[in-house]
Every structure is written in C-alpha cells, then in structure tokens.
Amino acid sequence: MSLAHSLKSFNSFGLAQSCADLVEAHSKEAVQAMCLPLWQQQLPMLVLGGGSNLVFTEDFNGTVVRVLSKGIKVSEDAEAFYLEVEAGENWHELIQFTLEHGMFGLENMALIPGTVGAAPIQNIGAYGVELCDVCDWVEYLDLPSGEFVRISTAECQFAYRESIFKDKLRNLAVVTAVGLRLVKRWQPRLAYGPLQSFDPATVTAREIFERVCQVRSEKLPDPAVLGNAGSFFKNPIVSAACYLDLAQRFPTIVGYAQADATVKLAAGWLIEQAGLKGFVLGNAAVHDKQALVLVNRGGATGRDICRLALHVIAQVQDKFGVVLEAEPRIMGANGEGDLYV
C-alpha cells in the first residue's frame, strides 16, 4: 500500500513512489523551521530540489521537504560580478538570467537539470567547467547547531562530483544559498568535443550556451517524455599507467588528462564499447543515443533501474577492468542506500 503523497512528479525518472509527508519550504527560514524538528527527533527526512539526481527504490517512510526558495542578488566590483542565489532557483534558468545581464562563465553548464541548492553537493559540471570554478561560497543550515553557516569554496572540499556535503556534512547540512563569482574578463572554455570548432578570439558566451543546449537536447532525452536522471555514471578517473595500458588495447578510447596526472575516461564510450547502447532490461534501458543515460521506458521501478545499472557496471568491468560509479542518490524506505537493493 503506497503512502499518502505521490513523488512521481517530483523525480525525473518518473518513478511511482510515495512518501508519508510532503512539505514545501519557500524561504531559508522555512527550511530551518521544517527540517530542525525532524532532525532533532531523528525522523526520516529527505530534502528535495529538482529530483533530478534520485532513484527511489521504495516508498519513503518520512517527510520530503521541497526547497522552493527563490531570489538572485547581484553586486559587482572592478573584477567580477557576485551573485547570491537561493537554493530553490532552477539552475538552467539562472544561466539564462546571467547571459541576459551580461554575466558570463556558466554557459558550459547549460541544461544541467536541477536546482542551485543541489549544485555544490555534486559539484556539477559539463564541457570542461565545474561549479567549483565559479563558486565563491555556500550557505547551509547546520542541523546539529540549528544555525546558518557560510563556508568558502576551499572549505567545500570540491572534487569531481564530490564535496564536503557528500562527506563530512552528509545528512548534517541543508544548502540554502550559493554565492557565485563571475569574472568580467571572461575566457571561453572550449576544450571539449562540440566546442572545439569555435574560435576563442571571436566566440561569444551566448554561442557556447546555444551549442551546449543543442548538443544536450540531441543526446539527452527529455525527462517529461522518457524518465531519466541525465548522466547516470561518473566518468572514471584512472592512473596514467592504467590509461596507457587501456589505450594500447583500445586505441580509440576517450580520455582527458587531469591536472594531477590522472586521466578521466569517458564512461559513455566504455558503456557503448561494451555493447550496451540501447540495451533493454525489463522497463529500464540504456539510452540508444547516449549510453551514459539510463531511462525509464514506462512503468520501470527504482529496483529495475538499479538492476540495469549493476549490469552495466559488471559488463564494463569485465571488458575494461574499470569500475563505474553511479551519480544519483539511491533512496530506500528510511534513507539513502546503494544499488544493491
């Protein structure tokens, strides 16, 4: 028997799960008022932004708090624009706002689904730019103290799809606002695939934005039509020696050298070369245009998605010796779990 409140329209996979209670917070004070009593009573609680990075495997036996706070404040000095953005703002709409007001630097991250509050948790990124490149600070509700805390970018301990919010502050913090610093002497970032054809001397931020939107729209299915969470797997990072070994065996392997001498592999390429592009398992499938994306073909459960993900991980490991990691959070009845449900 499902619980009182359906979550189907609040998760981009379109999974038909429910929760015991569903509340909306339209300000950081409301976040504080709603989340603190739940945390203090040790009751199951899930803070939800856009629901674009979640796989529900069961009904959630607790309260889902939807963060819907809005607001963008802008200040500037000679060097940069400074934005204070509330957690409930839509990420893509924020990028549109910055472009309309002559502020550049976010355009490579166009069409990443979700809200601003989720951005620092995952250190979201695309086409060579990550949130950490433009983040100035993050404000969060510290659940143990009940106070609002603001920490610097360095204190966020950002790494590839990682942050302090997934580590030391996991389940202890609710992001309420993000500070961004967009420099006025804008430099285009054109290292990745579809952007390499641009001339860095003449390209505009708007042109990059439109190209990224075009490419993402062609490759990534619309969640309203075909449920998905965008990129399901992280691009694995391997040692230079491992990469050279793989490149000898698979000369067309796609890899990007990192500053610390490691190499980031293209997970989509690995999945496709393992023969899994378009692979179907029940009502879940690997997308036939972008192998990095798992989709709900209609009627899939969270467990179906997890079973497919485990199959992909096993096949890629068998062929390449590389272990893929899932990006989305896996949510069970009482909190976060893993793929093995």
UniProtKB/Swiss-Prot annotation:
Output one GO BP term: peptidoglycan biosynthetic process
Q: Which residues form the FAD-binding PCMH-type domain?
A: 15-185
Where do the TM regions start and end? none
Catalytic activity reads:
UDP-N-acetyl-alpha-D-muramate + NADP(+) = UDP-N-acetyl-3-O-(1-carboxyvinyl)-alpha-D-glucosamine + NADPH + H(+)
- Keywords on record: Cell cycle, Cell division, Cell shape, Cell wall biogenesis/degradation, Cytoplasm, FAD, Flavoprotein, NADP, Oxidoreductase, Peptidoglycan synthesis
Record-level GO cellular component terms = cytosol
List its EC numbers.
1.3.1.98
The protein's required cofactors: FAD
The residues annotated as the active site are R161, S231, E327
Single GO MF descriptor: FAD binding
Does the record bear Cytoplasm in its keywords? yes
Compartments in which it is found:
Cytoplasm
Database matches in SUPFAM superfamilies: FAD-binding/transporter-associated domain-like, Uridine diphospho-N-Acetylenolpyruvylglucosamine reductase, MurB, C-terminal domain
Q: Report the InterPro entries cross-referenced here.
A: FAD-bd_PCMH, FAD-bd_PCMH-like_sf, FAD-bd_PCMH_sub1, FAD-bd_PCMH_sub2, MurB, MurB_C, MurB_C_sf, Oxid_FAD_bind_N
Specify where it is mainly localized. Answer: cytoplasm
The similarity comment for this entry is: Belongs to the MurB family.
Query: HAMAP family from the entry?
Result: MurB
NCBIfam families per the UniProt record, alphabetical: murB, PRK00046.1, PRK13903.1
**What job does this protein perform?**
Cell wall formation.
Q: What protein name is recorded for this chain? A: UDP-N-acetylenolpyruvoylglucosamine reductase
UniProt source species = Shewanella baltica (strain OS195)
Please name the taxonomic classification of the source: Bacteria, Pseudomonadati, Pseudomonadota, Gammaproteobacteria, Alteromonadales
Q: Provide the gene name from the record.
A: murB
